Regions:
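Class I S-adenosyl-L-methionine-dependent methyltransferase catalytic core
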Residues: 1-83, 93-336
Length: 336
């Protein structure tokens, strides 16, 4: 899952760093632990409407904008381009806000306990900073949550479309489908098929609603993208029964993200290695295998199994600070 790892700015005294070999980890300091809060559907709807106030007319307009883009135009889109994002947020934001980041707290719990967080010095300072920029309280707290606690983002549909164009994808397998950006991109480009797999059964209803929206956008004379969604552990799927010429996914950054119903693995040995081996095995000849993974996973897992990448696509992201030199890639292999 795409994750922007926000650099911490200012003298918050929130983190201390420890170094083990090449890997640096940041430890939580000074924040009280709260039990996970599960709001009612009504409360979740209210929060999501504040964060993503969109209606069907706006969603359709966004979809049409994506449809009008050629592959060449898609390639030229900047990191600022948000077209299509509101569609994904409209259907899956409610579930995404349950996700815990590196500080082991989700946004619903953060918002529920805002009286405590208001008293944290650097959060109080940021609330004052945002006072003149956005009057809505929920949005202010979400900005701060993204900045200091966790910024778990969607995979932008426009970026998925760029990858599909780059490898001439027709039949896509996405074994950690996440929030729907890659599905939306496949549908807009009218690819032959999209197979999505996710263990989080809470996403079944949001995806059903998204697919209903997409079906209403289809042109009668066009061939429809065949969509198959499988809600189960990706390790238990029989891939020999699936037909795909492109694997494209963005697995969870297991040391940063914690989703509902997420299984606890030794991620390298029990998830990445067997998943890459089995999905590569049944990938069509001349097909493409595309992974958005951290550099250490690329080096320690992907290279021993797949060899060096044949090409890569940089993840276009906004530059939030002058020192934010972190780059993220989609690594691509062709099966010959």
């Amino acid at each position: 899952m795409f994750l922007y790892r926000m650099p911490i700015t200012g003298n918050t005294k929130k983190y201390k760093e420890t170094t083990t070999g090449k890997n640096k980890t940041k430890k939580k300091m000074g924040l009280k632990h709260f039990p996970t809060y599960f709001p009612s559907d009504t409360e979740k709807e209210m929060i999501c409407m504040k964060l993503n106030p969109s209606n069907e007319e706006e969603l359709v307009k966004d979809y049409r904008k994506l449809q009008l883009l050629s592959c060449n135009q898609i390639k030229k889109q900047s990191a600022e381009t948000r077209v299509g994002n509101r569609i994904v947020d409209h259907f899956t934001l409610k579930e995404r806000l349950h996700t815990k980041g590196q500080q082991k707290i989700d946004f619903y719990t953060f918002w529920k306990n805002r009286a405590y967080f208001r008293k944290v010095p650097y959060i109080r300072k940021m609330l004052d900073f945002y006072k003149s920029r956005d009057t809505d309280e929920i949005r202010k707290f979400k900005y701060i949550f993204n900045l200091y606690l966790s910024s778990i983002s969607i995979f932008r549909p426009i970026l998925a479309m760029e990858l599909y164009c780059m490898v001439s994808a027709k039949r896509v397998l996405d074994f950690t489908m996440g929030w729907g950006g890659r599905l939306l991109g496949a549908h807009v480009l009218n690819l032959e098929s999209y197979i999505g797999i996710d263990i989080n059964t809470e996403l079944r209803q949001p995806y059903d609603r998204m697919i209903s929206f997409l079906r209403e956008r289809e042109q009668p004379l066009n061939k429809q993208t065949q969509i198959q969604l499988i809600f189960k552990d990706a390790l238990k799927v029989d891939y020999i029964t699936l037909d795909y010429d492109t694997v494209f996914t963005s697995p969870p950054y297991y040391d940063y993200e914690e989703y509902r119903h997420m299984k606890q693995y030794d991620w390298k040995e029990e998830f990445y290695e067997p998943m890459i081996k089995v999905t590569w095995k049944y990938l069509k000849k001349n097909g493409h295998y595309c992974l958005n993974v951290p550099e250490d996973i690329y080096e320690t897992v992907c290279v021993p199994i797949l060899g060096q990448y044949h090409s890569k696509l940089i993840m276009k992201k906004k530059k939030r600070t002058k020192t934010a030199n972190y780059k993220e890639f989609i690594y691509i292999w062709k099966k010959v």
